[in-house]
């Protein structure tokens, strides 16, 4: 039995249990001749237990026979940081000019534990520094030890 060859990858951020044929999902899948309804059903079933509307980075692998598989990653660090800081959006200014909120180092460590599978490190301290850097870029002050 021969192995399927990969035709391409599609990277999308899709809300949990919220895949619909509307843009951006429909056009992205339609260009690669993927069954849009089947993907939406499979994705919504796979993410049904999660909180609705959570943004989920998803990598869809399209094969030469127009079949597909997908991998759902953890939500972006910015989603968790905004949730911990109780803000709706980050700062539009540069790092030190306009801080819009605070987040603790312990919160950054908790986020790092959740995100470590998607980060380019397996060291929890390095992952925490990555999350702290994301917080600073969003205009969040990291407080704590």
UniProtKB/Swiss-Prot annotation:
Keyword Cell cycle (UniProt): no
Q: Which GO terms describe its biological process?
A: translation
What's the PTM story here?
Answer: One or more lysine residues are methylated.
Gene3D superfamilies (alphabetical): Ribosomal protein L11, C-terminal domain, Ribosomal protein L11/L12, N-terminal domain
Q: Which GO terms describe its molecular function?
A: large ribosomal subunit rRNA binding; structural constituent of ribosome
Q: Which SMART domains match?
A: RL11
List GO terms (cellular component aspect). Answer: cytosolic large ribosomal subunit
Q: Subunit info?
A: Part of the ribosomal stalk of the 50S ribosomal subunit. Interacts with L10 and the large rRNA to form the base of the stalk. L10 forms an elongated spine to which L12 dimers bind in a sequential fashion forming a multimeric L10(L12)X complex.
Protein name according to UniProt: Large ribosomal subunit protein uL11
What gene makes this protein? rplK
